Amino acid sequence: GRVSVGGSPATAVVLGVTALYPPGRRPDLVISGINHGSNAGALLALSGTVSAALAGTVLVDPPIPGFAVNAARAVADEPIDSVANRAQLDAVARDATNLIAAHRNWFCDGGRVVRPRTVLNVNYPGLPVSQLKGTRMTRQGSASDLSIVFEQTAASEYTARARRVEATDDRDSD
């Protein structure tokens, strides 16, 4: 059946794992996404997609590893539900499923979770999946190309404003 949760993506994961799954039948992996856009660097702190994948590793006992999937639009100036962007999401879903299957033994060995406090955050660029040259493991960077501030716009109202800034980080980070 379907369940609706009035909370964050991370809250939904914790509720699902601790209360909705039958006792003794917990998942081996928390999969979150597909998020529209990239989640990298310092902006991970704002990501519901990554937080949901992370929730199983830090808020559930015993911990469950996580896998977050993010994808840039195939055509940036078209709506998310355009034909090209829907095709991109379908291709990313198939590829991410294959990626998870290929790395299943990295997370689990003989049905036993061996990396319970691990989250993999996968970012797909806005290219056709068929043009990708493979995957590469990196570490989380600390740079962000956005600066976010909240400005008061009325007596009890604040509006987020973002501006682009130059970001530099190690070459081998996200």
Where are these regions (language model features)?
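Short glycine-rich anion-binding loops that position phosphate/pyrophosphate groups of nucleotides
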Residues: 8-9, 35-38, 127
